[in-house]
Amino acid sequence: MTERRVPFSLLRSPSWEPFRDWYPAHSRLFDQAFGVPRLPDEWSQWFSAAGWPGYVRPLPAATAEGPAAVALAAPLAAPAFHRALNRQLSSGVSEIRQTADRWRVSLDVNHFAPEELTVKTKEGVVEITGKHEERQDEHGYISRCFTRKYTLPPGVDPTLVSSSLSPEGTLTVEAPLPKTATQSAEITIPVTFEARAQIGGQEAGKSEQSGAK
């Protein structure tokens, strides 16, 4: 099967700036995820709950000693946070949605300009690639590169795969699913007797009677 590159439409606003700062001025260095699925809204509640592995209960002396005691707990929470996040991302969490008639995958690529993204299909697989050379950001110099592959559902026509880029930097790749064969209504077929067989039997009986005479 030949390789096919999928063009994507831009849904950018007129004032879009590809290299503008997407995050507040106090963004941290580890807030530079790219090429990863968008995190569900429920995760923000999960991260702040006492049930997740990265949660650290404030030290008893925190109220008495002020911010210094809270700072001691922060280094303990950060590694656990990253371990839990990596476990979730490596376990197959992804924005893949499939309805009765459509297959769709969403990917956060806000660090890449449109010309730095490539979407193509080959042998029933959608491959998304993003790459930009070293450039300066608020933390220094950085270059990024990623490749993600998704298997198309059986029966999907690769030539019908399309993609679009939203103003928020979310790449959406989708394709229509093949229509299932509709089952016909139940029909009762009557059984009929062939008249020729009956006529043939009567003629054979007459010939036997004439031969006996």
Swiss-Prot record:
<keyword id="KW-0206">Cytoskeleton</keyword>
<dbReference type="GO" id="GO:0042026">
    <property type="term" value="P:protein refolding"/>
</dbReference>
<feature type="modified residue" description="Phosphoserine">
    <location>
        <position position="184"/>
    </location>
</feature>
<dbReference type="GO" id="GO:0005737">
    <property type="term" value="C:cytoplasm"/>
</dbReference>
<keyword id="KW-0539">Nucleus</keyword>
<comment type="similarity">
    <text>Belongs to the small heat shock protein (HSP20) family.</text>
</comment>
<dbReference type="InterPro" id="IPR008978">
    <property type="entry name" value="HSP20-like_chaperone"/>
</dbReference>
<feature type="modified residue" description="Phosphoserine">
    <location>
        <position position="91"/>
    </location>
</feature>
<dbReference type="GO" id="GO:0051082">
    <property type="term" value="F:unfolded protein binding"/>
</dbReference>
<feature type="modified residue" description="Phosphoserine; by MAPKAPK2 and MAPKAPK3">
    <location>
        <position position="15"/>
    </location>
</feature>
<keyword id="KW-0143">Chaperone</keyword>
<dbReference type="GO" id="GO:0043066">
    <property type="term" value="P:negative regulation of apoptotic process"/>
</dbReference>
<dbReference type="GO" id="GO:0005819">
    <property type="term" value="C:spindle"/>
</dbReference>
<dbReference type="GO" id="GO:0009408">
    <property type="term" value="P:response to heat"/>
</dbReference>
<feature type="domain" description="sHSP">
    <location>
        <begin position="84"/>
        <end position="192"/>
    </location>
</feature>
<feature type="modified residue" description="N6-acetyllysine">
    <location>
        <position position="131"/>
    </location>
</feature>
<keyword id="KW-0488">Methylation</keyword>
<dbReference type="InterPro" id="IPR002068">
    <property type="entry name" value="A-crystallin/Hsp20_dom"/>
</dbReference>
<feature type="modified residue" description="Phosphoserine; by MAPKAPK2, MAPKAPK3 and MAPKAPK5">
    <location>
        <position position="90"/>
    </location>
</feature>
<comment type="function">
    <text>Small heat shock protein which functions as a molecular chaperone probably maintaining denatured proteins in a folding-competent state. Plays a role in stress resistance and actin organization. Through its molecular chaperone activity may regulate numerous biological processes including the phosphorylation and the axonal transport of neurofilament proteins.</text>
</comment>
<dbReference type="GO" id="GO:0044183">
    <property type="term" value="F:protein folding chaperone"/>
</dbReference>
<feature type="modified residue" description="Omega-N-methylarginine">
    <location>
        <position position="12"/>
    </location>
</feature>
<dbReference type="GO" id="GO:1904115">
    <property type="term" value="C:axon cytoplasm"/>
</dbReference>
<feature type="modified residue" description="Phosphoserine">
    <location>
        <position position="27"/>
    </location>
</feature>
<dbReference type="GO" id="GO:0042802">
    <property type="term" value="F:identical protein binding"/>
</dbReference>
<dbReference type="InterPro" id="IPR037876">
    <property type="entry name" value="ACD_HspB1"/>
</dbReference>
<dbReference type="GO" id="GO:0061077">
    <property type="term" value="P:chaperone-mediated protein folding"/>
</dbReference>
<feature type="modified residue" description="Phosphoserine">
    <location>
        <position position="94"/>
    </location>
</feature>
<keyword id="KW-0963">Cytoplasm</keyword>
<keyword id="KW-0007">Acetylation</keyword>
<keyword id="KW-0597">Phosphoprotein</keyword>
<dbReference type="Pfam" id="PF00011">
    <property type="entry name" value="HSP20"/>
</dbReference>
<dbReference type="GO" id="GO:0001932">
    <property type="term" value="P:regulation of protein phosphorylation"/>
</dbReference>
<feature type="modified residue" description="Phosphothreonine">
    <location>
        <position position="182"/>
    </location>
</feature>
<feature type="modified residue" description="Phosphoserine">
    <location>
        <position position="207"/>
    </location>
</feature>
<dbReference type="GO" id="GO:0005634">
    <property type="term" value="C:nucleus"/>
</dbReference>
<feature type="region of interest" description="Interaction with TGFB1I1">
    <location>
        <begin position="78"/>
        <end position="213"/>
    </location>
</feature>
<dbReference type="InterPro" id="IPR001436">
    <property type="entry name" value="Alpha-crystallin/sHSP_animal"/>
</dbReference>
<feature type="modified residue" description="Phosphoserine">
    <location>
        <position position="106"/>
    </location>
</feature>
<comment type="subunit">
    <text>Homooligomer. Homodimer; becomes monomeric upon activation. Heterooligomer; with HSPB6. Associates with alpha- and beta-tubulin. Interacts with TGFB1I1. Interacts with CRYAB. Interacts with HSPB8. Interacts with HSPBAP1.</text>
</comment>
<dbReference type="GO" id="GO:0099641">
    <property type="term" value="P:anterograde axonal protein transport"/>
</dbReference>
<keyword id="KW-0346">Stress response</keyword>
